[in-house]
């Protein structure tokens, strides 16, 4: 997969040069391209924003630099243009999985008070992280892109690594433990030391179900309980 990122602050995406995503780039599993919107402005002072028509606080990103940067990206990337903005659908794991199946993607990061409305006809999809305000689209783009890239086969080293993680099936992940066995008076659950893989699997499943029901009832209501789940929870099969 190739991802092109259109931004006013390219240096913010240097985080992808490290750790798992950095290794995936080195191994040619994925390709990231960062384009500076400011490089494509026709303004001699490299200005990319202006005052809003009709008045109001703040500045609005002008259409010309953005649209020309989109066109520049599309010379080598025919993927969907995804804009990080408050009008979009709330991003979730299912959306990450769907987007990970795309061959290429282009991410547009807004800034200031937003983008000129005339840019929207060049956008295929708008996503939001939630009902809160960030200082720029870059802050939202980083977790969205990371959640997509880690689903690409080979990025995590083994494809099954993400299958048991939180949200993969609307369940929070079970508790994890490592050495030492005892820490500040709290010990690792004995079942995890038993070596009985089937019992461990059932214990982990029960922990995930209980955690999700208690912490994220909004997710739990979407969970379809199996007969085994109901038995683990001590509920009657219905």
Curated annotation (Swiss-Prot):
Source organism superkingdom: Bacteria
GO cellular component: cytosol
Record key words, sorted: Cytoplasm, Methyltransferase, S-adenosyl-L-methionine, Transferase, tRNA processing
GO molecular function: tRNA (guanine(37)-N1)-methyltransferase activity
Compartment annotation: Cytoplasm
Gene Ontology process terms (BP): tRNA N1-guanine methylation
Disulfide bond positions: none
Subunit structure: Homodimer.
Family: Belongs to the RNA methyltransferase TrmD family.
Designated name of the protein: tRNA (guanine-N(1)-)-methyltransferase
Gene that this polypeptide is encoded by: trmD
């Amino acid at each position: 997969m190739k991802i092109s990122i259109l931004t006013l602050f390219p240096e913010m995406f240097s985080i992808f040069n490290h750790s798992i995503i950095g290794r995936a780039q080195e191994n040619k599993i994925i390709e990231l391209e960062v384009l500076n919107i400011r490089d494509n402005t026709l303004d001699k002072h490299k200005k990319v924003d202006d005052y809003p028509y009709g008045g109001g606080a703040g500045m609005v990103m002008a259409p010309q630099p953005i649209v020309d940067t989109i066109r520049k990206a599309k010379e080598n990337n025919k993927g969907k243009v995804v804009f990080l903005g408050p009008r979009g659908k709330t991003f979730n794991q299912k959306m990450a999985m769907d987007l990970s199946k795309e061959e290429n993607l282009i991410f547009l990061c807004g800034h200031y008070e937003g983008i000129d409305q005339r840019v929207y006809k060049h956008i295929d999809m708008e996503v939001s992280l939630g009902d809160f305000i960030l200082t720029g689209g870059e802050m939202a783009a980083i977790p969205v892109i990371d959640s997509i890239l880690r689903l690409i086969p080979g990025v995590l080293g083994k494809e099954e690594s993400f299958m048991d993680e939180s949200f993969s099936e609307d369940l929070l992940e079970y508790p994890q433990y490592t050495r030492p066995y005892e820490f500040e008076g709290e010990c690792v659950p004995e079942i995890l030391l038993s070596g009985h893989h089937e019992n461990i699997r059932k214990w982990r499943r029960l922990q995930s179900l209980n955690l999700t029901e208690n912490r994220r009832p909004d997710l739990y209501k979407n969970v379809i309980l199996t007969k085994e789940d109901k038995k683990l929870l001590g509920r009657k099969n219905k």
